[in-house]
Amino acid sequence: MTEIIDGKALAQKLQLHLANKVEQMKEKHGLVPGLVVILVGDNPASQVYVRNKERSAIKAGFKSETICLSDSISEEELIEIIEGYNQDPSFHGILVQLPLPAHINDKKIILAIDPHKDVDGFHPMNTGHLWSGRSMMVPCTPAGIMEMLSAYHVDLEGKHAVIIGRSNIVGKPMAQLLLEKNATVTLTHSRTKHLSEVTRCADVLIVAIGQGNFVTEEFVKEGAVVIDVGMNRDKNGKLIGDVNFDHVAQKASLITPVPGGVGPMTITMLLEQTYQAALRSVTK
């Protein structure tokens, strides 16, 4: 029988535990973890994500600040704002919401963030730490998926994990985290030939390509664990994943829904990494 992974319930449980840790930090060190989220422009999806992050941060007892900037801001002005938060000891996490307007180079912006405050885990220094097995800040979605797999007692050792999507945000860091758990990893992408033949070999299938209902039951072997990272809208405006949930759930042993699966865990790991950054600031 298929079990649905309840990412929302798990996230709530972990955030409650995190709130207790924050309270202990206040009592022991007189310190409150600080997170600033910088939003450029008025992308509706980004606005929703940012509101959810701020709401969760405040609920967990964090100092939370959201900076909303015009999409006409220059690259230099944005970097200057980031530099200010790099120097501010009351903020331990800095997140610049992507995507950015076309005239701003997102690589330059990521480089401008202090790696010790880069709670998205996108700075090249943190990427290097991840691939050398000494990770400090890890991209939040892969980190959240690993937490989910652990909570649902998915043993990864020796298992074949297939990832659809090779982005720097999900696919590539996901591969490294799975390798660290001794899984055998196949990273597929838009140029992979005979994709469904590859994915049917997967004990664990992670899908992050941004195409609604792309993965159907023919991509999945019986009893596989299926993690859907996709967030898409169908023609009626309904939120759907990259996986055709109704069809694939008939074959999977474990599957994440959309919404209520990976998304809440991404925010949870963002908060956890901000907390850890704050903790390092008083224990270094």
Curated annotation (Swiss-Prot):
GO CC annotations on file: cytosol
Annotated EC: 1.5.1.5, 3.5.4.9
Keywords: Amino-acid biosynthesis, Histidine biosynthesis, Hydrolase, Methionine biosynthesis, Multifunctional enzyme, NADP, One-carbon metabolism, Oxidoreductase, Purine biosynthesis
UniProt-annotated binding residues for NADP(+): G165, R166, S167, S190
TM annotation in the entry: none
Keyword Oxidoreductase attributed: yes
GO MF, one annotated term: methylenetetrahydrofolate dehydrogenase (NADP+) activity
A GO biological process held by the record: L-histidine biosynthetic process
Subunit structure as annotated in this protein's UniProt entry: Homodimer.
Its job: Catalyzes the oxidation of 5,10-methylenetetrahydrofolate to 5,10-methenyltetrahydrofolate and then the hydrolysis of 5,10-methenyltetrahydrofolate to 10-formyltetrahydrofolate.
Protein name stated in the entry: Bifunctional protein FolD
Organism expressing this protein natively: Streptococcus mutans serotype c (strain ATCC 700610 / UA159)
